[in-house]
Amino acid sequence: MEDKQQGFATFGGPVILTLVCEVATRALKAVRYQKFNVHRRLRPEGVGGLIDRYLTIPNLQDGELKPIAPLVEALRNERLLDRVNQFNNGQSYLLPMAFPEGSPMHPSYGAGHATVAGACVTILKAFFDHGWQLPLGKDEATGRYIAYEPNADGSGLVEVLLEQPLTVEGELNKVAANISIGRNWAGVHYFTDYIESLRLGEQIAIGILEEQKFTFGENFTMTVPLFDGGARQI
């Protein structure tokens, strides 16, 4: 952003916080439409249930569950079904989930959390210096940047050495990714739900920024880095 004046209702905290809230509500409405009116993708739990019934109730294999036969065969070829069956002591082909109540009742694609995360961090990357580098120390022996990551059991932090410094853009991307991937870990989404919904949220945020620019009296530009490595100037 080229304007160097102190902001309040335009480039200050109130407008940024307001836009983050606004883009979140628009993202939820947009992804809700995709869920119910376009894709209606079955949740992983639902797919797992169909696979379990296919394998445990043989008379369904040539009936109502025949369409999933190619999927079951592909999983057999990768020996995934054997691993799941062994893990469950032969009792079920279902995998454990993080939610005791099971998956949400609405369709899987796109992911609401990922869409909101993609939209909100895009707003933040637009208003802040996304290239700003975090002031990390350097290792004297190698000259690499010192950062930290959790140890194997999550009880503490261990030092890691980085070739490149951490930036605002990179850290915001991590936040969006962690929010989105967390839903995959929980067992309620697929990878494509995550990555494509981040991009959907990004496009919603860019649309709002383009729309909002006409309401500003200042002549300014914003360069927004994109998840695919490109950039968009507003």
Q: Model-flagged regions — what are they?
A:
Residues 1-234:
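Hydrophobic alpha-helical bundle signature of multipass membrane enzymes
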